């Protein structure tokens, strides 16, 4: 038990020292740097060209959906690699667990596919237009 605590203590000291170095470097640079703001420094740098318009560019939300799906399956590979290296020692139970894991991810992919998140060009819906609101025989509309 004493070795376990010393192992966690080492990790904790390493974490604290890492945070101290990052925060200390940031604060030292902040205190030592000169502060002379001007419009040239505050403008967006575009390879020597004068900035035209805003630096903010609107992206289609589909980029983010595809990126999230990619990250999910990329992390899946990270989880499957250690399993694949020790598959023979783990046995059939580990195989069933991995098949369930992959099955859940495949269900998520099928859901995204059926929902249309993977279709880059979505068809525009055909909404029927009514010429005017139906009127009752009495002449009053919905009354």
UniProtKB/Swiss-Prot annotation:
<keyword id="KW-0472">Membrane</keyword>
<dbReference type="GO" id="GO:0005886">
    <property type="term" value="C:plasma membrane"/>
</dbReference>
<keyword id="KW-1133">Transmembrane helix</keyword>
<keyword id="KW-0874">Quinone</keyword>
<feature type="transmembrane region" description="Helical">
    <location>
        <begin position="63"/>
        <end position="83"/>
    </location>
</feature>
<dbReference type="InterPro" id="IPR038430">
    <property type="entry name" value="NDAH_ubi_oxred_su3_sf"/>
</dbReference>
<dbReference type="GO" id="GO:0030964">
    <property type="term" value="C:NADH dehydrogenase complex"/>
</dbReference>
<keyword id="KW-0812">Transmembrane</keyword>
<dbReference type="InterPro" id="IPR000440">
    <property type="entry name" value="NADH_UbQ/plastoQ_OxRdtase_su3"/>
</dbReference>
<dbReference type="InterPro" id="IPR023043">
    <property type="entry name" value="NAD(P)H_OxRDtase_bac/plastid"/>
</dbReference>
<protein>
    <recommendedName>
        <fullName>NADH-quinone oxidoreductase subunit A</fullName>
        <ecNumber>7.1.1.-</ecNumber>
    </recommendedName>
</protein>
<keyword id="KW-0520">NAD</keyword>
<feature type="transmembrane region" description="Helical">
    <location>
        <begin position="90"/>
        <end position="110"/>
    </location>
</feature>
<dbReference type="GO" id="GO:0048038">
    <property type="term" value="F:quinone binding"/>
</dbReference>
<comment type="similarity">
    <text>Belongs to the complex I subunit 3 family.</text>
</comment>
<comment type="subunit">
    <text>NDH-1 is composed of 14 different subunits. Subunits NuoA, H, J, K, L, M, N constitute the membrane sector of the complex.</text>
</comment>
<keyword id="KW-0997">Cell inner membrane</keyword>
<comment type="function">
    <text>NDH-1 shuttles electrons from NADH, via FMN and iron-sulfur (Fe-S) centers, to quinones in the respiratory chain. The immediate electron acceptor for the enzyme in this species is believed to be a menaquinone. Couples the redox reaction to proton translocation (for every two electrons transferred, four hydrogen ions are translocated across the cytoplasmic membrane), and thus conserves the redox energy in a proton gradient.</text>
</comment>
<dbReference type="GO" id="GO:0050136">
    <property type="term" value="F:NADH:ubiquinone reductase (non-electrogenic) activity"/>
</dbReference>
<dbReference type="GO" id="GO:0008137">
    <property type="term" value="F:NADH dehydrogenase (ubiquinone) activity"/>
</dbReference>
<keyword id="KW-1003">Cell membrane</keyword>
<dbReference type="Pfam" id="PF00507">
    <property type="entry name" value="Oxidored_q4"/>
</dbReference>
<feature type="transmembrane region" description="Helical">
    <location>
        <begin position="7"/>
        <end position="27"/>
    </location>
</feature>
<keyword id="KW-0813">Transport</keyword>
<keyword id="KW-1278">Translocase</keyword>
């Amino acid at each position: 038990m004493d070795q376990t605590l010393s192992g966690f203590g080492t990790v904790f000291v390493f974490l604290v020292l890492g945070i101290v170095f990052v925060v200390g470097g940031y604060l030292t640079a902040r205190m030592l740097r000169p502060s002379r703001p001007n419009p040239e420094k505050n403008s967006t740098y575009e390879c020597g060209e004068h900035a035209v318009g805003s630096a903010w560019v609107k992206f289609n939300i589909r980029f983010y959906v595809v990126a999230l799906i990619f990250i999910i399956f990329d992390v899946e590979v990270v989880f499957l690699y250690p399993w694949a290296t020790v598959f023979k020692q783990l046995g059939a139970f580990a195989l069933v667990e991995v098949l369930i894991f992959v099955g859940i991810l495949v269900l998520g992919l099928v859901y995204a596919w059926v929902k249309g998140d993977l279709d880059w060009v979505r068809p525009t819906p055909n909404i029927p237009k009514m010429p005017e609101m139906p009127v009752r025989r009495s002449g009053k509309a919905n009354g």
